């Protein structure tokens, strides 16, 4: 491995003390995983080259947020032509849509996406209005089956995702297989539609045909204008509790496995969305733990170190039941006392313990509202 090869990005950090944005040159050396930072305005070294294990090559793409020693940086642009050529030439984003018939198989589908080398950059479980469904199916306006398509896509929750990799549009279409699930079972038996679809309408998932089509469709589901797009699916009932898949688990590609484990234990995931939290949001959410839990600062840093996935969980007496299913906060203790729990299976340390869950019954609805009413808006 070439230890002198480096990739350069222009990055921005919001300084909460000065209430201004500071711009840096971020250098990443893939040979040894080290980073270096230069202050653009003052033309000086801000961080000398040092090893940093929590940043990986797949994290480096325009628009992503990365955490460098507790500073959350937004990657704005490539810093030199070499980086632009090497990392920007083939990277594409596309829309991956799980249809109502396959939402219960979201874990399996996300696992397939992860194993194919995609990075999941946005995710939201949502419901479409008839108008939103009509706008989505604009290319089928003259088709005789248009009404059937609209009725199906509005019949229940869907999961929209933005996924990223080289040649994303073509690779996602390959994973999907032929549009008709019956044909897919013959021609591409390992494809998503072959495994989880029924026919040409109820065919589990959707992918755009071109890069231009992907850009148009992603604008429908994840508008760049700042409006929140189609409505989330949160029910906000008294049978609600909150689960958050922590950034380290998302980064390690564990989301699909965690979703399958939750479903197989009999819990209903009634809402789900990916969030990129900032420190202020996390401190607000974790306020109840401040001064109570000794690892409070480390908990905060982990939760804004990358994207997390928040869920609304439904079951009778959900808070206590789901909390027991998550297991003790320390995964080592969980592996000894409760080996079948989420933290025992997927956790690493007391901070990187895979999931947060609501601790007190009276906080379940409040935590769900924080994500799906406040942050989503």
Swiss-Prot record:
Keywords, alphabetical: Cell projection, Cilium, Cytoplasm, Cytoskeleton, Flagellum, Hydrolase, Kinase, Nucleus, Transferase
UniProt-listed SUPFAM superfamilies: Nucleoside diphosphate kinase, NDK
UniProt domain DM10: residue ranges: 3-91
Compartments reported by the entry: Cytoplasm, Cytoskeleton, Microtubule organizing center, Centrosome; Nucleus; Cytoplasm; Cytoplasm, Cytoskeleton, Spindle
Tissue: Expressed in trachea multiciliated cells.
Listed InterPro entries: DM10_dom, NDK-like_dom, NDK-like_dom_sf, NDPK7, NDPk7A, NDPk7B, Nucleoside_diP_kinase
Cellular component GO terms, alphabetical: axonemal A tubule inner sheath; axonemal microtubule; centrosome; gamma-tubulin ring complex; nucleus; sperm flagellum; spindle
EC number: 3.1.-.-, 2.7.-.-
Family: Belongs to the NDK family.
Domain remark from Swiss-Prot or TrEMBL: Contains 2 putative kinase domains (92-225 and 241-373 AA), the first one is involved in autophosphorylation and the other may be inactive.
Protein task: Possesses an intrinsic kinase activity. Displays 3'-5' exonuclease activity with a preference for single-stranded DNA. Does not seem to have nucleoside diphosphate kinase activity. Functional component of the gamma-tubulin ring complex, implicated in the regulation of the microtubule-nucleating activity of the gamma-tubulin ring complex in centrosomes, in a kinase activity-dependent manner. Part of the dynein-decorated doublet microtubules (DMTs) in cilia axoneme, which is required for motile cilia beating.
Protein name: Nucleoside diphosphate kinase homolog 7
